[in-house]
Amino acid sequence: MQKRKVRNAWLFISSLIVGLFSFPFAFAKSVEKRATQFKNSVSNLHVSDFVPTIPSAVSVYDSLRLNLAGLNRRAFELAQQGYEKLREQGTLLNDNIISIIDFSLPSTEKRLYVVDLKNYQVLYKTYVAHGRNSGSVMANSFSNNPSSNKSSLGFYNTLGTYIGKHGYSLKLEGLEKGINDNAYNRAIVMHGAEYVNPNYISKLGYIGRSLGCPAVASREATPIINTIKDGSCLFIYSPNTAYQEHSSILRYLAEDKV
C-alpha cells in the first residue's frame, strides 16, 4: 500500500515536471503560429490598399449628379480620360480643375461646366458662346482654319491671362494637331462678352455668337478665368464622330488599352 502511494506521488511529480518544461515550447509554438498568420495577412495587402486612387469618371459623374446638372455622360467620360492622359504626361500644372463645354447642348442652355476634381464640386455651370459659323442654336460645324469663325473641338491647355479688346482674357493652347492646334494663332481665347446673355434668347432664339472663342458672360469672366488659368484642362465636346475618330489624344487612349 505504501509502495503504491509512493509510486503515484512519483508519477504526479514526473508529470508536473514534464508539463513545466513543455509549456514554454507550446507557448512559443502558438506565438510562432500567430506571427506566421499575421505575416501572411500582411503579405496579402497591396500598396493600393493604402494609397488613395483618383476617382473614376463614373464615380465623379454619379457622385456629383452631373446627369441632373445636364452634362452629357459621354462628354464627361471622354474629358476625364483625356485629362488623365495629359496629367500623366505632365502637361497640366493646375490639375485639380477640369472644364467641359458640352456642345451636345444648345446655346440656350448652360453648357460650360467647371469641376473641382479634388474637392468634388461643380464650381461653375454657365452659358458659353460658340463660333458664329458653327451654327445658330447648336454648334454643329467646326474648324481649325484661320478666319473660319468656327469653334474647334478637343482638348486645350489653359495658359496665362492678358487685357485685350474684350477685357480680361485667357489664352488657350490647342493640344490636338489638325483639330485645334491653330487656336493660339487664331487668337481663340476665353473672354467676357455682353452678347453671352440670356436676354438674347428671347430676341434671337439663342445667345450671341463669337468668332470662334468660348466667350462667357462679362460678369463671370474674371472669376472663371482666375479659376481655370495656368495649366488646367479644357475639353470642348460634341457628339461629332469625326472628331472622336481623329482625336490624337483619344486615339492614344485607345492604343494604351490594346
Task: Briefly describe each language-model feature range.
Residues M1-Q37:
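Bacterial Sec-dependent N-terminal signal peptides
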Residues S238:
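Active-site proximal loops enriched in glycine and acidic residues that flank catalytic Cys/His/Asp
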